[in-house]
Amino acid sequence: MKPNIHPEYVTTEVTCSCGNTFTTRSTAKGGSIHVETCSACHPFYTGKQRVLDTAGRVAKFQQKYAKVQAKKGK
């Protein structure tokens, strides 16, 4: 490997929005990373399902295809 071209590989603290923190190593500057989901709160790892924006998607779908249903009903 060439000397003096690789970024510094330092200990970094990762903080999740759920409050969970853990330490890893990274080339990120500042020594800390903030994430929205981690293995402690992600539905895949916890086994609990969370609905994020289903209501908005359903409403958007119904608005989009309401005209089609009205034409079929006539």
Swiss-Prot record:
Pfam families found in the cross-reference section: Ribosomal_L31
Superkingdom of source: Bacteria
Cystine crosslinks: none
GO BP annotation list: translation
Cofactor binding summary note: Binds 1 zinc ion per subunit.
Residues where Zn(2+) binds: C16, C18, C38, C41
Keywords, ordered alphabetically: Metal-binding, Ribonucleoprotein, Ribosomal protein, RNA-binding, rRNA-binding, Zinc
PROSITE patterns reported in the protein's UniProt record: RIBOSOMAL_L31
NCBIfam families (UniProt xref): L31 (TIGR00105), PRK00019.1 (NF000612), PRK00528.1 (NF001809)
Function of the molecule: Binds the 23S rRNA.
Family designation: Belongs to the bacterial ribosomal protein bL31 family. Type A subfamily.
Protein name in UniProt: Large ribosomal subunit protein bL31
